[in-house]
Amino acid sequence: MQLTVKALKGKEAHIQVSEGDTVLAVKRLVEEKLQVPVSQQRLLFRGKSLADEHCLSHYSIGPGSRLNLMVKDQVAPEGHSGNNTAWKSLSVILRKHFSPADAERVLEYVQKDYERSLSLLSLDDIERLATRILHPQYSEAADLGFLD
């Protein structure tokens, strides 16, 4: 089905999607068409903000629907843009080996799993990781201590 995505500043794009596509997949298509990074996009349908993980069918978005695009100001902490580069690189690699739809699904899964893994880290986990990175000589001794 075809959707129209209209940015508040006048740009407009027509994209081809299916009802089973996620909002995140739509955002990636919008990024290609309008050159607006996914991280800066906020899509609205009938005044309601759309969540990345939901399918278009969840919001009853059908053929010919019109989505509004709000562009957020670019505010990214240092080092965060490297994450975007990593996801783009992974996307390029996946598209070489899978169909575009399958590559998109795999990328979404990896991103969700990555975010989930990060959210499960405790402060103790982060402290142990930091110690191993900053003081590798101490972490080896600490690892041996757990074996006793």
UniProtKB/Swiss-Prot annotation:
It is found in: Cytoplasm, Cytosol; Nucleus. Transmembrane segments: none annotated. One of its GO terms (molecular function) is protein-folding chaperone binding. One of its GO terms (cellular component) is nucleus. SMART domains: UBQ (SM00213). GO terms for biological process: post-translational protein targeting to endoplasmic reticulum membrane; tail-anchored membrane protein insertion into ER membrane. Gene3D superfamilies: Phosphatidylinositol 3-kinase Catalytic Subunit, Chain A, domain 1 (3.10.20.90). Residues 1-76 form the Ubiquitin-like domain. CDD domains: Ubl_UBL4A_like (cd01807). Keywords: Cytoplasm, Nucleus, Transport. Component of the bag6/bat3 complex. As part of a cytosolic protein quality control complex, the bag6/bat3 complex, maintains misfolded and hydrophobic patches-containing proteins in a soluble state and participates in their proper delivery to the endoplasmic reticulum or alternatively can promote their sorting to the proteasome where they undergo degradation. The bag6/bat3 complex is involved in the post-translational delivery of tail-anchored/type II transmembrane proteins to the endoplasmic reticulum membrane. This is Ubiquitin-like protein 4A. It comes from Xenopus laevis (African clawed frog). The lineage of its organism: Eukaryota, Metazoa, Chordata, Craniata, Vertebrata.
